[in-house]
Amino acid sequence: MEADFVILSLTPILIGCFAAMACALPGNFLMLRRQAMLGDAISHVVLPGIVVAFLFTGSASTWAMMLGAGAAAMVSVLLIEGIRRLAGVEPGAAMGVTFTTMFALGVLLLEGSGAGAVHLDVEHALYGNLESLIWLDATGWESLVDPVALAGLPPELGRMAAVFALIAIAGFIFWRPLVLATFDEGFARTLGLPVQAISLGLVAAAAMACVAAFTAVGSIL
């Protein structure tokens, strides 16, 4: 029973926990800034970028997905700003139009490009593939100290743990300016804090967490 838990359940639980914590750290600040919808937007707009990156490189590597997601995020920012100015609508409405359009485009690309027949498909892109991230080389708890067994861990575990650690360390280092810029932007500006750079860094952290968690929990979750 213990061996079955280590093989089948331990790594999916750990990956899910790291994904939840990595997304929650920037997500809480986005909520406090009344930008909770931005988290939804980021997780949706990265989908077409990830699909296009996969089609160009033929690889589902982290760096290719990061570049594709970053490009999609920049396009989305331009679209949101363009819609807001040209149509004269509120930023929230422009954001809603943009992220639903980008998400639909990503699903269409998945269905029409043939990527689903290789490594990407709609179901896994939307809901992830957490149940398949098992540790086949494990024999029990003793495998946690076995270098050979540890080499067979799903790469998503190390990737998600590294992203969580990076975001947590950055949050610890920049905690004071981040809190000041979140709760009193005017006061933060008078102190000479780079408020705009802090906001961009927060969005970048959220995007990084979304891309890292994409394989495990998908675009929606």
Language model region names:
Residues M1-A22:
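Membrane-interfacial amphipathic/re-entrant helices at transmembrane-helix boundaries
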Residues F103-A170:
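Transmembrane helix-bundle core of multi-pass membrane transporters
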Residues C17, M21-L25, A71-L78, L105, ...:
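Generic alpha-helical transmembrane segments of integral inner-membrane proteins
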Residues N28-S43, L47-L120:
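Short loop segments and helix-boundary regions at transmembrane helix junctions
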Residues L8-P12, S61-M65, I167, C210:
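Short alpha-helical transmembrane interface motifs in multi-pass membrane proteins
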Residues I13-F18, M66-A71, A93-V97, L157-A162, ...:
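Hydrophobic alpha-helical transmembrane segments
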